[in-house]
Amino acid sequence: MTRRIDILGAGLSGLSAATILSREGYDVHVYEIRADSGARFDGDFQGIENWTSDTDFFDEMREWGFDPEEFKATPFNIIDLIHPDDVITQPSTDKPAFRVVERGTDSHCIDQGFKRMAQAAGATIHYETRKALEECDIIAAGPKESSAIAFGEIFHTDHPNHVSFQLNDKLAPGAYSYLIIIDGIG
């Protein structure tokens, strides 16, 4: 008899676990309170860093059995780094320093790519379903509260893909601000 594994949360962690366990022959069921993976995001951009290791993170993903072609990722090897005195430097690398992905429910988002991989591996995902913590083998439900407040604007532009990272207390006291433009959306 195949062992059943119940996972709470259909975000990236829960879906990753579901994919690996399903491939190993487990009967995996994932429970998600929201209507879809990535539903708590609204087209937010996030960076996946790649500069702290000699091995490209997407190559590591492939070694683990995940296909980074399942979602859109835009590589960057240069960034505008805006210092507190407003001086701009442009650190760069020979390989992608990071990749920008989009979070959400659109088909090109990383959340949807991980959902497709989990389903292809055989996992069953139950959306809009509550499941008690004690009934689950893996808890991957994400944060219950916000740890920061972020303000953002989404706009359309003909500016090329670009990332600026600003360390300036005038704009973001004690924190940072950034600008990301991917395919005409900033």
Model-assigned labels for residue ranges:
Residues L8-A10, S22-D44:
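Glycine-rich FAD pyrophosphate-binding loop
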Residues M1-D6:
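Extreme N-terminal starter segment of soluble prokaryotic enzymes
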Residues A35-P84:
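N-terminal FAD cofactor-binding segment of flavoenzymes
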Residues I82-V87, I182-I185:
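Short acidic-glycine loop/turn motifs at beta-strand connectors
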Residues V87-P96, Q166:
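Short amphipathic beta-strand/extended segments with alternating polar/hydrophobic composition
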Residues T52-T55, T93-R116, S146:
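Short beta-strand to alpha-helix junction loop
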Residues G14-L15:
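N-terminal Rossmann-fold NAD(P) dinucleotide-binding loop
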Residues A10, I20, R34, H108, ...:
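Predominantly flavin-linked oxidoreductase catalytic cores and closely associated redox partners
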